[in-house]
C-alpha cells in the first residue's frame, strides 16, 4: 500500500481529464471558485432564508403563471398559516417558496404576519442592482389591485339567528338565489416581464425595452460601434450586398476565364462565340467543380446571414433614432464622442437593468453593470481583446520570425496570421461571454494550458494548408481586378507606400478605437512619404533620371509620328506583331515609374525634422532612435514599417504559404510566455470583468506611477518594474492619446480651438530644428490659441476638440465623457505631460530658452515658475523645460487650465507663498486692495516696473 501511494505521487493518473474539460468545468464553477469575481459582485444565495428586495422580480415571474388571490384565498391563507407549525419544519426551510410573493402582496394579505428583524435586511451597497432598481421596477409596473375586505365579499342580510332558521334560510336561498350564480370573479391582472408582442408596440417603447433587457453590454456596444462605423442601416445593407456581389463576380468571372474560354482559338477568331466552350460547366474538372460548389454554398450562407442581420440592424436603427436622437443622415457626420455623451445620458436616465433574471444571470451582471459606461469603460469593452494583442506586440511576446535559415530574423505578420492568432489565442482564452476564463488566472494549470495552446497552433497550421490554395487564388484575382486599371492609368502608384499590418499594431494605443487610430495614421502619410524621400539616393536618382530620359524620348518620337500620320503609323509594326500603340504604352509606363523615383529639385533635405513630424502622429519613438534620427539605420527600420503596397500584397500572398511554418515552429515556443502573460497582466474591475492591466488607466494618480524604463539610468533599472511596464512609453502615450480624444467637452469647445491639419510644406518652417539658428523665432507662438509650430505640435496627435482641459472653464472636471472616478488629477496631468512631451523633441542642440518651466522634482534653487512664465514673448514656456528647442507655447500649468484667469491665480499663489496675503492686508475690500491688484496687473501683464505708492 505504501509503494502504491508513493508511485501515485510521481506517476500521472491514467484517466486525467483534458484541459478543455477542465476549462468547461471551470467556466461552470467560476462563480464559486473565483474569489476575486465574487468579492463585492455576486449575491449571497443562502443568507438564512431571509427575504431580500431582489425577490420582487422572481415574484413577478411567479405571478405570470397565476392570478391574484381572491378573498377566499385570503381566508385559506389564514387557515394555512395556523396549520404551518403542525406540518413540520420541512416546508419552512425553502426560502424561495416561503417568499415567492412580493412584500406588497404579503402585507396586503391579512393573517400573514411575518416577523422581519432590522438586522435581516441586506444593505443596498452589497447588492448588484440596489434598492433603487426595485423601486424603479415597481414604478414601471401598474399598481396592484386593492384586496377585498371581508365585509365587501357579500353584504350581510337580515335573517334568523337560530340554527334551524339558518338551515331553512340556506335552503330557500339555494332555491331562489339572491345573486347571479353565473357571475364570476374578474380575472386578476397578470404581470409578465418576458418578451412582449413587439410587433404591435411603439418603436420607441420597443427600443427602450431592448435597451432595458440588454444582458451583454460588450456585444451590444460592439453593435452600436459597428453601426456607427457603417454610417447607418442603409449604408451597411448596401455594403453587405455589394460585398456579396463582388464575391460572386470574382468567383464567376474567374470560373469563366479559366474554364469557358478556348485560348487556342483566340488568334484566328473574329467573334467571342468562336472561342467560347459550349456547356463549359459540365466539362470542368472534379476539383474545379468541388471548389465552385463550395464557394456557392459559402455565398448562400453569407446571403442568409445578411438577411438575418436585417432584424438586428432595424433594432439598432431604432435605438439610434429614438433613444439617442441620431438619424441616418446625421450619423454620417456626428462624432463618436457625441454618441458616447448620449449613451451616458441614456444610462443616467434609465439605470435599471433587465427585469427578471435568474440567480446565475444576476451573478453574471457583476461584469455587465450599466453604471460602468463612460468613455473609458466603453473603450475597454469594445477593445477587450484588442488591448491584449496590442500589449503582446508591444512587449514582443509573440515569436513571429520565419523558421527559414536566411530569413530567421525577419518577422512576418499578415492579415492571415492575425486571423490565426485570434482563432488560436483569443478564442482559447476568452469564453462565450467575452470574459477571460478564470482558469488562465491560476498557475495550477499552467502546463496543461500551455500544451493545449501548442496543440491549437499545430492544428491551425494543418488547417491553413488545406485552406491556403483557395484563399490565394481568390485574393490574387480580387487584387488583379481591383488595382490593375488603377496602375494602368497611373503607373507611378506602383511605388506608393503604406504601413504594414505589424506597424499598425505597433502604432495603435490602448483603448484607441479603430476610426480614431485610422484618422491619426492617415494624417501621418504625407509626412512619412516626405521622410522616405528625404534620404539621399544619388545612384538611384541618377539611374532613374537616365531611364526616364531615354523612355521619354522614344515615347515622344512615336507620339509625334502618330500625330503626323495616324492612319498609317498606328498600324505600323516596329517588331513582329508589336505596333506603335504597344510601344507607346510600354515607354510611357517606364517613364512614369522612373520619373516617380526622382524627387523634386526644390525639396529641402532635413530628414530629422521630417521624422519628428511622423512621430508626432504615429507616437512611435523607440529608445534606439534617440540621437540617431538622421542615420540610415533608422531609415531602414522605418522602411520596414512603411513599405510599398505591392510588396505588402506579395507578403500577404506568401504569408499564406509561410503561416503554417510559423504556427508549427515559431509560435509554440512562446506558448508558456503567452499563458504567463494573460495571468500576470489581467486585472478585475467591478462591473466590467477582466481587462488588460495596461488598458485600465489610473486617472486619479495620473502617470506618476507609470514606469518608464527608458528614462532611468541603466545601473538603476529595476527588472521587475521593466517587466510589468510597457516598452517605448506605450502606456503613457495611450493615456494622453485617450485624454486628447475624450478629455475635452464635445459641446464646450470653440471651433477655433481645434487643431488644424496642414500637409507638409516644401521647406522646413521656423519651428524646425534647422531654423533654430535664426534665433528665438521658434519660441514665438500664437497667443489666441496658444498653438505650437508645426515642428513641435502636440505630442499625442490631432485633437478633435482642442487642447485637453481647455474646453470647460467653469468646472475642474475636464470632460463630461468621463465619470467622476475617471477624472484625471491636475498635478499628475501636468507633470507627466511635460515628461512625455520631451520624448518627441529633436536631438539637436538648441539655443537656451529663457524662463523654462521646472518639474516638481527639480532643485528649489532654480528660478521660480512665476519668473519663467513671463518670457519675452509673453507666452507660457514649453513643457519640455530648458532643453526643448524651438517649441512654441503649449499647455503649461495644465492643472489650472479649467480656470478663467490663469495669471491672476498664479499671482495669488506666489503672493501667498511669499508670506504676504493681499486680502488680509487690504481687509478684503477697499481702495488699498484695488490699488495692489492694479499694481500686479501692470507688473505682470505689461512687463513694466510699477512705481510704488
Curated annotation (Swiss-Prot):
Family according to the record: Belongs to the ATG9 family.
UniProt-recorded name of the protein: Autophagy-related protein 9
Reaction(s) the record says it catalyses: a 1,2-diacyl-sn-glycero-3-phosphocholine(in) = a 1,2-diacyl-sn-glycero-3-phosphocholine(out); a 1,2-diacyl-sn-glycero-3-phospho-L-serine(in) = a 1,2-diacyl-sn-glycero-3-phospho-L-serine(out); a 1,2-diacyl-sn-glycero-3-phosphoethanolamine(in) = a 1,2-diacyl-sn-glycero-3-phosphoethanolamine(out); a 1,2-diacyl-sn-glycero-3-phospho-(1D-myo-inositol-3-phosphate)(in) = a 1,2-diacyl-sn-glycero-3-phospho-(1D-myo-inositol-3-phosphate)(out)
Cytoplasmic side: 1-232, 311-431, 478-542, 600-645, 667-949
Membrane topology label: Multi-pass membrane protein
Alphabetic keyword roster: Autophagy, Cytoplasmic vesicle, Endoplasmic reticulum, Golgi apparatus, Lipid transport, Membrane, Phosphoprotein, Transmembrane, Transmembrane helix, Transport
Region described as Disordered: 1-197, 748-919
Intramembrane spans: 432-477, 646-666
Domain-related comment: Forms a homotrimer with a solvated central pore, which is connected laterally to the cytosol through the cavity within each protomer. Acts as a lipid scramblase that uses its central pore to function: the central pore opens laterally to accommodate lipid headgroups, thereby enabling lipid flipping and redistribution of lipids added to the outer leaflet of atg9-containing vesicles, thereby enabling growth into autophagosomes.
Record InterPro entries: Autophagy-rel_prot_9
Assembly: Homotrimer; forms a homotrimer with a central pore that forms a path between the two membrane leaflets.
Its biological purpose: Phospholipid scramblase involved in autophagy and cytoplasm to vacuole transport (Cvt) vesicle formation. Cycles between the preautophagosomal structure/phagophore assembly site (PAS) and the cytoplasmic vesicle pool and supplies membrane for the growing autophagosome. Lipid scramblase activity plays a key role in preautophagosomal structure/phagophore assembly by distributing the phospholipids that arrive through atg2 from the cytoplasmic to the luminal leaflet of the bilayer, thereby driving autophagosomal membrane expansion. Required for mitophagy.
Localization in the cell: Preautophagosomal structure membrane; Cytoplasmic vesicle membrane; Golgi apparatus membrane; Endoplasmic reticulum membrane
Gene it is expressed from: atg9
Posttranslational modification: Phosphorylated by atg1. Atg1 phosphorylation is required for preautophagosome elongation.
Originating species: Aspergillus clavatus (strain ATCC 1007 / CBS 513.65 / DSM 816 / NCTC 3887 / NRRL 1 / QM 1276 / 107)
Record topological domains on the Lumenal side: 254-289, 564-578
Superkingdom of this protein's organism: Eukaryota
A Pfam cross-reference name: ATG9
GO BP terms: mitophagy; piecemeal microautophagy of the nucleus; protein localization to phagophore assembly site; reticulophagy
Gene Ontology terms for molecular function: phospholipid scramblase activity
Biased composition (Basic and acidic residues): 35-57, 75-85, 129-139
Amino acid at each position: 500500500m505504501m509503494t502504491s501511494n508513493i508511485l501515485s505521487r510521481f506517476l500521472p493518473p491514467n484517466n486525467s481529464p483534458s484541459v478543455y474539460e477542465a476549462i468547461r468545468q471551470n467556466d461552470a464553477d467560476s462563480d464559486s471558485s473565483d474569489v476575486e469575481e465574487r468579492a463585492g459582485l455576486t449575491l449571497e444565495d443562502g443568507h438564512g432564508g431571509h427575504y431580500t428586495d431582489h425577490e420582487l422580480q422572481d415574484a413577478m415571474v411567479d405571478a405570470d403563471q397565476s392570478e391574484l388571490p381572491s378573498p377566499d384565498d385570503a381566508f385559506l391563507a389564514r387557515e394555512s398559516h395556523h396549520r404551518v407549525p403542525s406540518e413540520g419544519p420541512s416546508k419552512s426551510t425553502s426560502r424561495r417558496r416561503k417568499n415567492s410573493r412580493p412584500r406588497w402582496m404579503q402585507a396586503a394579505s391579512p393573517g400573514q404576519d411575518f416577523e422581519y428583524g432590522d438586522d435581516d435586511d441586506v444593505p443596498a451597497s452589497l447588492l448588484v442592482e440596489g434598492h433603487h432598481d426595485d423601486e424603479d421596477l415597481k414604478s414601471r409596473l401598474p399598481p396592484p389591485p386593492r384586496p377585498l375586505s371581508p365585509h365587501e365579499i357579500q353584504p350581510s342580510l337580515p335573517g334568523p339567528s337560530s340554527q334551524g332558521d339558518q338551515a331553512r334560510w340556506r335552503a330557500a336561498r339555494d332555491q331562489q338565489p339572491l345573486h347571479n350564480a353565473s357571475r364570476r370573479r374578474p380575472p386578476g391582472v397578470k404581470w409578465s416581464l418576458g418578451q412582449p408582442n413587439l410587433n404591435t408596440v411603439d418603436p420607441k417603447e420597443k427600443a427602450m425595452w431592448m435597451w432595458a433587457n440588454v444582458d451583454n453590454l460588450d456585444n451590444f456596444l460592439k453593435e452600436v460601434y459597428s453601426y456607427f462605423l457603417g454610417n447607418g442601416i442603409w449604408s451597411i445593407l448596401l455594403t453587405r450586398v455589394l460585398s456579396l456581389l463582388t464575391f460572386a463576380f470574382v468567383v464567376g468571372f474567374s470560373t469563366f476565364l479559366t474554364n469557358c474560354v478556348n485560348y487556342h482559338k483566340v488568334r484566328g477568331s473574329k467573334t467571342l462565340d468562336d472561342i467560347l466552350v459550349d456547356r463549359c460547366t459540365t466539362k470542368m474538372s472534379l476539383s474545379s467543380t468541388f471548389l465552385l460548389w463550395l464557394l456557392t454554398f459559402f455565398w448562400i450562407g453569407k446571403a442568409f446571414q445578411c438577411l438575418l442581420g436585417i432584424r438586428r440592424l432595424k433594432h439598432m436603427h431604432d435605438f439610434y433614432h429614438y433613444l439617442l436622437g441620431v438619424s441616418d443622415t446625421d450619423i454620417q457626420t456626428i462624432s463618436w464622442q457625441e454618441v458616447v455623451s448620449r449613451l451616458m445620458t441614456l444610462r443616467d436616465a434609465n439605470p435599471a437593468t433587465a427585469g427578471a433574471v435568474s440567480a446565475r444571470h444576476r451573478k453574471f451582471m457583476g461584469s455587465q453593470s450599466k453604471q460602468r459606461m463612460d468613455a473609458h469603460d466603453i473603450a475597454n469593452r469594445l477593445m477587450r481583446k484588442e488591448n491584449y494583442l496590442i500589449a503582446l506586440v508591444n512587449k514582443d511576446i509573440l515569436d513571429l520570425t520565419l523558421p527559414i535559415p536566411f530569413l530567421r530574423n525577419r518577422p512576418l505578420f499578415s492579415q492571415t496570421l492575425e486571423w490565426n492568432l485570434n482563432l488560436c489565442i483569443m478564442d482559447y482564452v476568452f469564453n462565450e461571454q467575452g470574459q477571460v476564463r478564470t482558469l488562465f488566472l491560476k498557475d495550477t494549470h499552467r502546463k496543461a494550458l500551455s500544451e493545449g495552446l501548442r496543440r491549437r497552433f499545430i492544428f491551425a497550421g494543418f488547417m491553413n494548408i488545406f485552406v491556403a490554395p483557395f484563399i490565394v487564388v481568390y485574393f490574387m484575382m480580387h487584387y488583379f481586378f481591383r488595382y490593375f486599371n488603377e496602375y494602368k492609368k497611373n503607373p507611378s502608384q506602383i511605388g506608393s507606400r503604406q504601413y504594414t499590418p505589424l506597424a499598425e499594431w505597433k502604432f495603435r494605443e490602448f483603448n484607441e478605437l479603430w476610426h480614431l487610430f485610422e484618422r491619426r495614421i492617415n494624417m501621418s502619410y504625407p509626412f512619412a512619404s516626405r521622410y522616405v524621400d528625404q534620404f539621399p539616393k544619388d545612384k538611384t536618382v541618377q539611374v532613374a533620371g537616365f531611364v526616364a530620359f531615354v523612355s521619354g524620348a522614344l515615347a515622344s518620337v512615336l507620339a509625334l509620328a502618330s500625330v503626323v500620320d495616324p492612319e498609317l503609323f498606328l498600324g505600323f509594326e516596329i517588331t513582329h506583331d508589336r505596333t506603335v500603340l504597344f510601344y507607346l504604352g510600354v515607354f510611357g509606363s517606364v517613364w512614369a515609374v522612373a520619373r516617380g523615383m526622382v524627387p523634386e529639385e526644390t525639396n529641402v533635405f532635413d530628414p530629422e525634422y521630417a521624422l519628428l513630424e511622423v512621430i508626432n502622429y504615429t507616437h512611435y519613438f523607440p529608445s534606439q532612435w534617440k540621437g540617431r534620427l538622421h542615420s540610415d539605420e533608422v531609415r531602414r527600420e522605418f522602411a520596414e514599417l512603411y513599405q510599398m503596397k505591392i510588396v505588402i500584397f506579395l507578403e500577404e500572398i506568401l504569408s499564406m504559404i509561410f503561416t503554417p511554418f510559423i504556427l508549427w515552429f515559431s509560435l509554440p515556443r512562446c506558448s508558456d510566455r503567452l499563458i504567463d502573460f494573460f495571468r500576470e497582466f489581467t486585472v478585475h474591475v467591478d462591473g466590467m470583468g477582466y481587462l488588460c492591466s495596461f488598458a485600465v488607466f489610473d486617472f486619479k494618480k495620473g502617470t506618476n506611477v507609470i514606469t518608464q524604463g527608458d528614462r532611468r539610468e541603466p545601473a538603476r533599472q529595476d527588472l521587475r518594474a521593466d517587466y510589468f511596464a510597457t516598452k517605448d512609453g506605450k502606456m503613457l502615450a495611450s493615456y494622453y492619446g485617450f485624454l486628447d480624444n475624450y478629455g475635452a467637452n464635445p459641446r464646450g469647445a470653440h471651433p477655433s480651438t481645434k487643431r488644424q491639419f496642414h500637409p507638409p510644406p516644401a521647406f522646413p518652417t521656423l519651428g524646425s530644428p534647422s531654423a533654430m539658428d535664426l534665433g528665438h523665432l521658434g519660441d514665438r507662438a500664437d497667443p489666441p490659441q496658444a498653438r505650437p509650430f508645426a515642428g513641435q505640435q502636440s505630442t499625442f496627435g490631432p485633437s478633435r476638440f482642442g487642447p485637453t482641459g481647455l474646453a470647460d472653464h467653469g468646472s475642474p472636471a475636464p470632460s463630461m465623457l468621463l465619470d467622476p472616478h475617471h477624472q484625471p488629477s491636475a498635478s499628475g496631468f501636468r507633470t507627466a505631460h511635460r515628461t512625455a512631451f520631451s520624448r518627441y523633441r529633436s536631438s539637436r542642440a538648441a539655443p537656451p530658452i529663457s524662463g523654462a518651466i521646472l518639474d516638481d522634482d527639480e532643485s528649489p534653487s532654480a528660478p521660480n515658475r512665476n519668473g519663467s512664465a513671463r518670457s519675452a514673448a509673453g507666452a507660457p514656456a514649453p513643457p519640455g523645460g530648458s532643453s526643448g528647442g524651438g517649441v512654441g507655447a503649449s499647455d503649461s500649468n495644465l492643472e489650472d487650465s479649467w480656470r478663467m484667469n490663469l495669471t491672476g491665480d498664479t499671482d495669488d499663489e506666489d503672493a501667498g507663498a511669499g508670506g504676504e496675503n493681499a486680502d488680509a492686508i487690504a481687509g478684503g475690500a477697499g481702495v488699498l486692495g484695488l490699488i495692489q491688484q492694479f499694481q500686479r496687473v501692470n507688473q505682470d501683464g505689461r512687463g513694466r516696473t510699477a512705481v510704488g505708492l
